[in-house]
């Protein structure tokens, strides 16, 4: 996943994509970055729910947040293995992009 994304769809637009209703509410955001709490869609007891989750993992040996995993090794790495098998979610997004620091 890229380092930034936006979500401007409203609840009605998301509900049109799913067979059962999604409960919850959220404002549009155009610059969601690691460390923030974006909205995700999770499935519990055959119902979809909107939840906010913290984006990123703190690893003691690293200064930056870990924000993504390689699909080829996600089921092998200790940090991601259990999460990948048990705690999946959908991350709704209208766009994604990498931040450019060249002019700073």
Question: In which residue ranges do the predicted regions lie?
Answer:
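Short linear sequence motif anchored by a di-proline
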Residues: 1-104
């Amino acid at each position: 996943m890229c380092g930034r994304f936006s979500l401007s769809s409203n609840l009605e637009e998301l509900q049109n994509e799913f067979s059962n209703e999604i409960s919850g509410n959220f404002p549009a955001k155009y610059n969601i970055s690691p460390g923030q709490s974006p909205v995700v869609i999770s499935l519990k007891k055959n119902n979809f729910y909107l939840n906010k989750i913290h984006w990123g993992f703190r690893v003691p040996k690293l200064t930056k947040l870990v924000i993504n995993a390689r699909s080829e090794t996600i089921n092998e790495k200790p940090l991601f293995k259990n999460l990948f098998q048990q705690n999946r979610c959908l991350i709704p997004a209208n766009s994604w992009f990498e931040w450019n620091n060249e002019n700073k």
